[in-house]
Amino acid sequence: MSAIARAAARVRQQNTTPLQRPLLLQRKPVLTHTLALHASPLKPSLATSITSPNFQQSFQRRWASASATAEEGAKEEVWPQRKLPELTETDKLRLRRQRNVGISAHIDSGKTTLTERVLYYTGRIRDIHEVRGRDAVGAKMDSMELEREKGITIQSAATFADWVAPKPPTELKEGETVGNTDKQKFAINIIDTPGHVDFTIEVERALRVLDGAVLVLCAVSGVQSQTITVDRQMRRYNVPRLAFINKMDRAGSNPFRVIGQLRGKLKMNAAAVQVPIGSESDFAGVVDIVRMKAIYNEGVKGNQIVETDEIPESVRALAEEKRAELIEQLSEADETLCDLFLDEAPITPTDIAQALQRATTSLRFTPVFMGSAIKNTGVQPLLDGVCAYLPNPSEVQNQAMDATLPAHAPTIPLVPATDAPLVGLAFKLEEGRYGQLTYMRVYQGELKRGSMIYNARTGKRVKVPRLVRMHADEMEDVDAVVAGEICAMFGVECSSGDTFTDGSSTYTMTSMFVPEPVISLSIRPEGNETPNFSRALNRFQKEDPTFRVHVDSESQETIISGMGELHLDIYVERMKREYNVACVTGKPRVAFRETITEAAKFNYTHKKQSGGSGQFGRVIGSIEPMETDPDTGKDTAFENRIIGGNIPNQFIPAIQKGFQEALDRGLITGHPITGCKFVLDDGSAHAVDSNELAFRLAAIGAFREAFNKARPVVLEPVMTVEIVAPIEFQGNVIGAINQRKGTIVDTEVRDDEFTLTAEVALNDMFGYSSQLRGMTQGKGEFSMEYKNHQPVLPNIQKEMAEAFRKKQLSK
């Protein structure tokens, strides 16, 4: 570690603040317009400037309503002072022994296999069953029949378990050392999530409500495409994580190459806290380099842990080298350890463990564990790491908003105290045997069976008839659930993302990020349409925000949209199995979009006179290109800059509604318009003839007038494609990607196989699965995820525009 790096590390530590949810997690829309219908959150990096008095004053001067009577140079707003609840000693003790953890990774990294071992070692299940149902049982967390058939996780599954582990490092008293204290029982809520990109919403909503996560990686494949996506989701919600390098028994496993990928590809400050004893088929255990102890799994299915100070000579040098590397990496993330390191003072195992906990919970470091879930090795030390290094609910600050205050008002910290007013978030819905099953994270207060709770979105008061804790598809009835817990309710009608309170507060929390669908296809029942067809589509839409249904206005076909072919195939199959409705589907369609590349002004008057009261509305302004907000996914906006009363306030929502209607159907190919901001600068109204309809039509006409002047283009979804195949087929694979007009981003060769990363238009990827199987003799595999929308080639846009024009003329 250079002197400059050491100094920089110390400066960074002096400026580091404790772990706090970022603006997105605090659900804190900080910029809103009094005339707009929705808040437009700014990026978290702008939080400091937004909360300054100068910003608030300039904000008020610029955005005050035309009808407001605010004086010149608005005064600084004063917000209500609140007395926050306090944690009792009972709460503190309970929360210190509570963990809410998700297990996420790329597909086939071993998440569900790992969760199965966790459940077995914690005593939640009596025997271990494998993922693909080879023993006709299947893994506990893959409870859906389709999951066991296909060997993949489709829905996230929740469970809970108790684990006895040593006291966390930061709770150690004087004279106590890490790992040598009395063991205590920890309650762990676990959510196992899908690894396939098509089911990314399951990962999204799980991470929204969790306090920590385990990122599982394959010791051979390392960081893969969905690993990058999961890492991005964890960063979006500021979720501290541990990394677990699985499949250490596989040929070609190299954990330190994977750690290098974590640092290089994910820009993660990560280091191993273990080194393997043996490699590949000889993998026998791990060395805990924090305490310098060898750990082996013995007994029936590895249920006995044997620790010894006798580290095999073959790995002693490696263990000492990686321990020094761990201390150096960790000293850049923890000020206390950095001081010891720079002063060349003795560093004890307790010093390292305490620094690991501080740096992990504050998102500055990721400890890396190793093992093989399928070989029952290394799972128990990982559980100890979850209890030692991941935060408890009281160490993560969650925020709520007051629905009675403007959206830019300060957020309210939620305190996980049992006697505080109830605040909970419904993050997932399922259709259970006894009605709707609503998964809930309780952030504050206590939720009791039979109690009355309020839906902050609808204002409705509902009763909780049944309260359960989930164990995959099994349920355990409970009378009450306290702050920090995850549970499920029966018989409560709501939507995903709804906030519930006990009625004593007006708090609300915002929901999770929902990506837009990228693929669509038409669907109809094989025979006569039955009520079950509509019932199934309605249910699937309610459960999955990324599954959309609409009826095409021209063909009158029912169109379903989702995140990929597999996503839609699963729902078609579920419709057949669960509702006995066999369906016929059309050819998949790509979700094309239209956008503008330049700003364009408009000055449009809508006038209609037919005797008596007519219609009059004039709007002046511009449309501008707009980047997608990476935190909220919002890519369209309406901005009112009118100062004065040229357009009465009651007509502004009608103008915004007209803008939203105009976005539904583009002028080049008829596809929805995205990436566009509507700026209203001025206009005029008529005392008699102006009404909402007139201004709505004026907005539509103005948008269409300006759209053609703003150099519009057609966009298509582009996918990041990752292909893994034997090295002898590399030439064929590259040739096929070039044939599909793909752009090769990266190629990595290891041993006898290679990994190719490319960006290819989704429209050019249809049929690739069969082609890859044929050219690699069935040995190649690929995965793809949505990257962004990019302009189509000019000749393609011309063809699409001509086809759309002919279609319109033929009507």
From Swiss-Prot:
Reading the lineage from the top rank, the first entry is Eukaryota
PROSITE patterns hit by this protein: G_TR_1, G_TR_2
Output the Gene Ontology terms for molecular function.
Answer: GTP binding; GTPase activity; translation elongation factor activity
Q: Which UniProt keywords apply?
A: Elongation factor, GTP-binding, Mitochondrion, Nucleotide-binding, Protein biosynthesis, Transit peptide
Output the GO biological process annotations, alphabetical, semicolon-separated.
Answer: mitochondrial translational elongation
Q: Where in the cell is it found?
A: Mitochondrion
Instruction: State the InterPro entries in the record.
Output: EFG_II (IPR041095), EFG_III (IPR009022), EFG_III/V (IPR035647), EFG_IV (IPR047872), EFG_V (IPR035649), EFG_V-like (IPR000640), EFTu-like_2 (IPR004161), G_TR_CS (IPR031157)
Residue positions binding GTP: 105-112, 192-196, 246-249
Q: Which Pfam families match?
A: EFG_C (PF00679), EFG_III (PF14492), EFG_IV (PF03764), GTP_EFTU (PF00009), GTP_EFTU_D2 (PF03144)
S-S bonds? none
Q: Has the keyword Cell membrane been applied to this entry?
A: no
Q: Tell me where in this chain the tr-type G domain is found.
A: 96-394
- Family label: Belongs to the TRAFAC class translation factor GTPase superfamily. Classic translation factor GTPase family. EF-G/EF-2 subfamily.
**HAMAP family with a match to the protein in the record:** EF_G_EF_2_B
UniProt xrefs under NCBIfam families: EF-G, PRK12740.1-5, small_GTP
- What is the role of the protein in this entry? Mitochondrial GTPase that catalyzes the GTP-dependent ribosomal translocation step during translation elongation. During this step, the ribosome changes from the pre-translocational (PRE) to the post-translocational (POST) state as the newly formed A-site-bound peptidyl-tRNA and P-site-bound deacylated tRNA move to the P and E sites, respectively. Catalyzes the coordinated movement of the two tRNA molecules, the mRNA and conformational changes in the ribosome.
- Can you say what this protein is called? Elongation factor G, mitochondrial
| Organism of origin | Cryptococcus neoformans var. neoformans serotype D (strain JEC21 / ATCC MYA-565) (Filobasidiella neoformans)
